[in-house]
Amino acid sequence: MRKGTLLMEKMSFEIYRYNPDVDAKPYMQRYELELEPTDVKLLDALVRLKAQDDTLSFRRSCREGICGSDGMNINGKNGLACLTDLRGLKQPVKIRPLPGLPVIRDLIVDMTPFFNQYHSIKPYVVNDNPIDSDKERLQTQEERKELDGLYECILCACCSTACPSFWWNPDKFVGPSGLLNAYRFIADSRDTITNERLDNLNDPYRLFRCHTIMNCVDVCPKHLNPTRAIGKIKEIMLKRAV
């Protein structure tokens, strides 16, 4: 279709819809959208679709791949809508909520099981050693470098909701994101409760339900490696046991 002198590109979408107040079961709704030159990422298209149909529900915030709000399943693979290039997607673009979590409405999932596991690993530095109030707890450059590839996690849940072990045991298995963050504090030279952190994970489910499927690595929008972090925790546990 032409708009002025420009040929407008049209894209088709099939989006998961479910409103528990009115729908007996979920369904896929088809949408057509004539793209504007400013439609670069999938989130751009979703925002425009919502302008046409204000009942369509999804989370979004920063639009920069920082907040992690707009995680969803895009053509069968978890990702962030704001980082997903729009025009290269196979059509119709099939968009579903992140798998393995209860659906609140449309593409919005209940993140409670995910954040329960995250909070269970005490995601903060613990150090009871006294220090002068006008000083910081210092690290060498080498100690700081140990945290690279760990602290960048934005808690979007793309990795944990791509993990079959988390689907099956969300109340028992910490999940890739939680375990990546657990290792982030185990590896932190300023933290003094390493043994407590390891004891917290020394359970048939919490850590050892990872089967190195590596879906987490494949979908992480920040290109992190939870499987490697999980392996590091297991290695530390083994060294502690012998």
Residue ranges of model-derived segments:
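Short, contiguous acidic and Ser/Thr-rich linear segments
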Residues: 29-40
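Short structural boundary motif marking the start of a folded domain
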Residues: 8-13
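Short, Lys/Arg-enriched N-terminal segments with co-localized hydrophobic residues
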Residues: 1-7
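Short, structured protein-protein interaction patches enriched in aromatics and acidic/basic residues
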Residues: 62-71
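Glycine-rich phosphate/adenylate-binding loop and adjacent beta-alpha elements
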Residues: 76-96
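Ferredoxin-type iron-sulfur electron-transfer modules in oxidoreductases and energy-metabolism complexes
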Residues: 40-53, 96-242
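Active-site phosphate-binding and catalytic loops of NTP-dependent enzymes
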Residues: 53-59
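Short strand-turn-strand beta-turns centered on an Asx-Gly dipeptide
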Residues: 34, 73-77
